[in-house]
């Protein structure tokens, strides 16, 4: 089987499954595992369709949020397109199991699923918010993968009633007094200056018992699904143990 992956997190997962030999093309943003020597076919939103066709893939993996429908439609003229859209940890488990079946790596898939199960432990309850963009400020709502990931270890998203990625002013959100503000460095490249600004604002809104800003930290721990989910859960359990 020849596959092209237009989803960096799926590229990493395919190699973790031991199916790397099936991968004949990847994006410019596929950085795990390190030192990949596969042909690059452009960005997630700017793929080179002609180059993908030249690779003669049987399957092209895409993600509903990361890739554009017009590119999926163009690729579907010469290859099977499999679209993924995991929004929960359970979705990730199903995705890994599906990839295991597709690439005849069922045993390895179950090993990865077991690692997710082993690290999916709810401990201390804490409230949180997660910004993903600035200018305007945007946050993870309750129906996002990021929210479900944090909730799986005991978190409570203060914006859980909002859908997708609502745009809300930073003062309004921090007035909710979250225990933790998680600050990933992608998709927006938040800096230490942003962390200091959020910490000051949070302290002003709840001076008696202000929450903590954690970050910036590698955003792929929160935004990449698949095998990277395991690393994300381990990161959260480390944070949780210090609450």
Predicted regions mapped to residue ranges:
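N-terminal ligand-binding lobe of clamshell/alpha-beta domains
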Residues: 1-243
């Amino acid at each position: 089987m020849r596959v092209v992956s237009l989803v960096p997190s799926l590229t990493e997962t395919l190699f973790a499954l031991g199916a790397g030999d099936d991968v004949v093309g990847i994006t410019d943003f596929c950085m795990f595992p390190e030192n990949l020597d596969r042909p690059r076919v452009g960005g997630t939103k700017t793929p080179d369709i002609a180059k993908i066709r030249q690779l003669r893939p049987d399957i092209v993996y895409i993600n509903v949020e990361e890739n554009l429908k017009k590119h999926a439609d163009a690729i579907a003229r010469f290859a099977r397109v499999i679209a993924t859209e995991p929004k929960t940890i359970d979705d990730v488990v199903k995705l890994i199991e599906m990839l295991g079946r597709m690439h005849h790596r069922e045993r390895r898939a179950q090993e990865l699923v077991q690692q997710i199960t082993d690290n999916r432990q709810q401990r201390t309850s804490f409230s949180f918010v997660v910004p993903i963009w600035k200018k305007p400020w945007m946050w993870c709502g309750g129906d996002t993968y990021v929210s479900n990931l944090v909730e799986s270890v005991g978190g409570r998203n203060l914006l859980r009633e909002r859908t997708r990625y609502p745009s809300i002013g930073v003062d309004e959100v921090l007035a909710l007094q979250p225990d933790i503000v998680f600050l990933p460095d992608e998709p927006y490249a938040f800096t230490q200056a942003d962390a200091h600004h959020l910490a000051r604002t949070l302290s002003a809104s709840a001076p008696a018992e202000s929450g903590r800003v954690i970050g910036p930290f590698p955003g792929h721990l929160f935004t990449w699904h698949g095998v990277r989910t395991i690393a994300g859960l381990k990161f959260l359990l480390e944070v949780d143990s210090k609450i």
